Regions:
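Charged, non-catalytic interaction/linker regions at domain boundaries
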Residues: 1-223, 227, 231, 236
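Short, charged amphipathic alpha-helical segments flanked by flexible coils
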Residues: 239
Length: 239
């Protein structure tokens, strides 16, 4: 049985959580951006894809808008990170409104992941998983760095994501007329997904599937694919 002192401590703990949640909910919604690169070839100028996905407006193009351009010194500050950013990758950026920086980053990355999962599931590699392979199966992947920006485009230095095991896609997808048709199909696919009654379950399983095929180690990929199956079937490892 809980002693009275323990009950009081627990109640104070619950109240402190409620207070923190209340503070967050009282914060105004603020616009944020996130920038990265993606394995589409950037040689063709212009915007290649722009769509509202989930809580974010996502855009793929050859160059960042001027608002989000940042000095090279920022990436240079990460040493080897700058050397790993592929120059032939297209630029990808997203915007959303959120109450905290962390919430904004999570929302946008989840929506970017959904976009890439639709593309990879529909048009991704048909290569099977082979033991000994040390590169991801997904052909559409983000670059090694994702950077958060505030509403005026200023870099938020405390929230930068870096993938230390980044593997470059040596032959990025070429943006041509066929690619434009594919992007339109992806857009229609996402629209249909949003209207589906099981959209949350489907989104979660698609993200898990895509995440599993982003991994370098095929053995870990198989574990991730099993988790995807568990999400879809509503089962766990002990069932």
């Amino acid at each position: 049985h809980l002693k009275r002192g323990n009950i009081n401590s627990f109640e104070r703990f619950i109240e402190s959580i409620k207070e923190e949640v209340s503070k967050i909910l009282r914060k105004p919604l603020v616009k944020y951006f996130i920038t990265s690169t993606i394995s589409f070839d950037r040689t063709k100028d212009g915007v290649h894809f722009s769509k509202k996905i989930g809580e974010s407006r996502l855009t793929v193009g050859s160059h960042y808008p001027r608002l989000l351009a940042f000095d090279a010194w920022f990436l240079n500050g990460f040493g080897d990170v700058n050397q790993n950013v592929p120059e032939n990758y297209a630029r990808i950026w997203a915007s959303t409104r959120a109450r905290t920086e962390e919430q904004a980053a999570n929302q946008m990355l989840r929506d970017i992941e959904l976009y890439m999962s639709v593309y990879n599931i529909t048009y991704g590699s048909r290569r099977g998983i082979t033991i000994g392979r040390r590169s991801p199966l997904n052909s559409v992947r983000l670059g090694p760095v994702q950077i958060l920006h505030d509403s005026v485009g200023k870099v938020i230095k405390d929230i930068v994501y870096y993938e230390p095991e980044f593997t470059v896609q040596n032959s990025p997808h070429i943006i041509d007329d066929n690619q434009a048709r594919i992007q339109r199909y992806v857009s229609i696919f996402i629209n249909c997904l949003e209207r589906n009654a099981l959209r949350n379950l489907l989104k979660a399983s698609m993200r898990q599937y895509s995440y599993a095929l982003n991994l370098n180690d095929p053995r870990i990929s198989l574990v991730g694919l099993w988790s995807c199956l568990e999400i879809l079937t509503g089962t766990t490892g002990d069932k």
